């Protein structure tokens, strides 16, 4: 059994969709998994575009030399904590991974899959779980009400109950 949360789910999807791997995967549990591209509103797309333009402008050496504290403060508030703490190379990897859509791989997964999701997840919304459930051939979805992206931490007893029932 392979179990993956968030980005770990993305890794498992890519692995399980391969034609052959050097070991057997009997079943998979994906928890609030990444892998489906987010649907962005026009306002969100515009915000991203403005961010990219501003970032290029603020990266100019002359501009930075004039306002280093302001620019450093602005940069310190951009992205997730993981992104802010990553090296520049790792940031590039994170951006590439987040923008990679794995939905075309989902029908290729041959193993039995259980999805466990928090209905209040904003990082990987419940909409993503429904897409995965629809596209993965042998798949079921368990939703933990009132939880977000870390459903297993927010309601551990309910999460454990789902896992125990599935793994019996």
Regions picked out by a protein language model, each given a short descriptive name:
Residues 2-4, 31:
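Short beta-strand immediately N-terminal to the catalytic nucleophile in serine-hydrolase-like folds
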Residues 4-9, 118:
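Conserved alpha/beta-hydrolase "nucleophile elbow" surrounding the catalytic nucleophile
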Residues 10-18, 23-59:
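Flexible "cap/lid" loop of the alpha/beta hydrolase fold
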Residues 30, 38-42, 56-111:
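Conserved alpha/beta-hydrolase catalytic His-Asp/Glu region
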Residues 108-109, 115-117, 121:
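Short beta-strand/loop motif that positions the catalytic acidic residue
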Residues 122-128:
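Conserved alpha/beta-hydrolase "acid-adjacent" motif
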Residues 133-150:
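Catalytic histidine neighborhood in serine/cysteine hydrolases
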Residues 147-160:
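Catalytic histidine-centered segment of alpha/beta-hydrolase-like enzymes
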């Amino acid at each position: 059994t392979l179990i993956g949360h968030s980005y770990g789910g993305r890794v498992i999807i890519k692995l399980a969709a391969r034609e052959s791997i050097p070991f057997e995967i009997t079943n998979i549990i994906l928890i609030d998994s990444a892998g489906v591209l987010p649907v962005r509103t026009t306002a969100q797309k515009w915000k991203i575009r403005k961010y990219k333009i501003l970032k290029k402008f603020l990266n100019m050496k002359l501009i930075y030399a004039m306002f280093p504290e302001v620019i450093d403060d602005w940069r310190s508030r951009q992205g997730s904590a993981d992104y802010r703490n990553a090296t520049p190379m790792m940031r590039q990897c994170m951006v590439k991974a987040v923008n990679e859509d794995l939905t075309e791989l989902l029908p290729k997964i041959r193993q039995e899959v259980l999805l466990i999701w928090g209905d209040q997840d904003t990082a990987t919304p419940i909409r993503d779980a429904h897409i995965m459930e629809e596209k993965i051939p042998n798949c079921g979805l368990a939703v933990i009400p009132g939880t977000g992206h870390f459903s297993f931490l927010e309601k551990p007893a309910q999460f454990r109950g789902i896992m125990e029932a599935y793994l019996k």
